[in-house]
Structures are given as C-alpha cells and as structure tokens.
Amino acid sequence: MAENKENVVLCGANSYEQKFYFNSDFKGLPEQIQKELQIMCVLYTEDVGGILTLVYEEDGQLCFEVTTEENDFMFDEIGSHLKIKELQRTKTELLESLQLYYKVFFLGEEL
C-alpha cells in the first residue's frame, strides 16, 4: 500500500452524538476484535464523556486521542487519564496486536 504521512484513525466513540466510528479500511480485522474495540471506546465515553479516537501515528504507534467540546463541564479529565492507563494495562495484548497488524499490512514492514 502507499505510504501515508498522516495519522490514520482506527476507530472512535463520541459521547455527544452517541456514535461509534470504525474505519472501513480495517474491515479485515476479525469481527470479535472490531466488537471489542467498539465496547472499549463506547464504555470509555459513557464513563468520562468526550470523544475518544484510536489513531495510528506515522510509525505505526497506536495512540488514544481525547477531545472535548468547549465548555464541557461534565467531562472527567482525571477519570479520562485513569481510564486510558487502565485500558493500556488491561488491553495490552490487543493494542500490541493492532500495532503489529498496522505495521505489517499498512506500512509493509517485515515481521
């Protein structure tokens, strides 16, 4: 595939619109993983609010990006940091597998 110099969104959830987005470029992922990502993102936004997006950086690193609407006083910033740390700890295997998948199938890296 062509090399992409921009960050690539894997998926995200929006508490304001109560919507989940999954990038169709990743439809090759097993359905169980897609469902696990949806549950993870939606539960995060139900817990702390805001918008959570899982984004691949240029080097294939998978990052959590959090944004909020201006003057969202209900957003739990401390809870957000704690929840992301918890997800990084409890979903380590999933997140590492997703990074490897992206590096091999999208960046063309060797194993």
Predicted regions and their residues:
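Non-catalytic accessory regions used for complex assembly or targeting
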Residues: M1-E3, E93, E109-L111
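Charged/polar positions within long, soluble alpha-helices
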Residues: L100-K103, L107-E110
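Amphipathic protein-protein interaction modules
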Residues: E46-Y102
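Phenylalanine-focused residue identity feature
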Residues: Y16, F20-F22, F26, F64, ...
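Short, structured coil/loop segments at alpha-helix boundaries
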Residues: L29-I33, C41, I84, L95, ...
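Negatively charged, low-complexity tracts enriched in Asp/Glu with abundant Ser/Thr
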Residues: M1-D47
